[in-house]
């Protein structure tokens, strides 16, 4: 880089009254609005990156689509910078939303209308007043065509996606200017982001799901985890009663069933019951009440009257 007083290609850029051998002055007046190194024009809604380089907001937006890096130093741009940019003059955004004239130009958004930036609005208004059918606009590094007859815009090399445009008064409700939200919309946007970032939305979803009835676990898992001792005992009692029922119905080995018939052609169990009754009659009444009755009741329970085998030969 050539220093002061050295001949270089930038010598022609010096003022005519400035000599090459004069020392450089550091008190040169600085521009109130910086120039953008991307579009090479005066910055429109200038923003400052973390690396302190300044560009147009739309120029940074277009460059971030190609790669999230500064166009000068290649430092990485934060992911949320486009949502929360650092504006050099936020007051300019408010004045731009109020407009300089009676009418302004808008393009259609997802849930409302966006106002064009001041430079693009001047180009559209100039083409409209001159009666042109279309005009070209450079927005965020892409060349767009504004069809003033059908009031739509599209990229010059991509006609598939079209967006409506309109010329309307300045005071209509709008989302913002050139992708920059106004304060009311930005507050709602930040609130929505905070709700999704701190887990409030997910917690609310969990709260809604907790009000729904819980899924029933399988029967076997429920029994193994929450069965009490009394339930286990009742289960064993049921099993015992089933076995007794099978015994009463004489479901078992057929060889055992054949042994129920005695030698005299009477059922063997009945003969034993008669012998037991004879013994009980010889005992004292107290003994009969203490011992005989339970035995008799037990035998009667084992072989009901309805299940006795008929008399006959085996």
From Swiss-Prot:
Chain spans, region Disordered: 281-314
A cellular component term, taken from the record's GO annotations: cytoplasm
Catalytic reaction annotation: S-ubiquitinyl-[E2 ubiquitin-conjugating enzyme]-L-cysteine + [acceptor protein]-L-lysine = [E2 ubiquitin-conjugating enzyme]-L-cysteine + N(6)-ubiquitinyl-[acceptor protein]-L-lysine
Domain of life: Eukaryota
GO biological process: positive regulation of canonical Wnt signaling pathway; protein autoubiquitination; protein K48-linked ubiquitination; ubiquitin-dependent protein catabolic process; Wnt signaling pathway
EC code: 2.3.2.27
Pfam families membership: WWE (PF02825), zf-C3HC4 (PF00097)
Listed GO MF terms: poly-ADP-D-ribose binding; ubiquitin protein ligase activity; ubiquitin-protein transferase activity; zinc ion binding
Pathway per the UniProt entry: Protein modification; protein ubiquitination
Cross-referenced InterPro entries: RING-HC_RNF146, RNF146, WWE-dom_subgr, WWE_dom, WWE_dom_sf, Znf_C3HC4_RING-type, Znf_RING, Znf_RING/FYVE/PHD
Binding site for a glycoprotein: 107, 110, 114, 144, 153, 163, 175
UniProt enzyme class: transferase
Zinc finger (RING-type): 36-74
All copies of domain WWE, residue ranges: 91-167
Principal location class: cytoplasm
Comp. bias intervals (Polar residues): 296-308
Annotated compartments: Cytoplasm, Cytosol; Nucleus
Domain free text: The WWE domain mediates non-covalent poly(ADP-ribose)-binding.
Function per UniProt: E3 ubiquitin-protein ligase that specifically binds poly-ADP-ribosylated proteins and mediates their ubiquitination and subsequent degradation. May regulate many important biological processes, such as cell survival and DNA damage response. Acts as an activator of the Wnt signaling pathway by mediating the ubiquitination of poly-ADP-ribosylated proteins. Neuroprotective protein. Protects against cell death induced by DNA damaging agents and rescues cells from G1 arrest. Promotes cell survival after gamma-irradiation. Facilitates DNA repair.
Protein's name according to its UniProt entry: E3 ubiquitin-protein ligase rnf146
Lineage: Eukaryota, Metazoa, Chordata, Craniata, Vertebrata
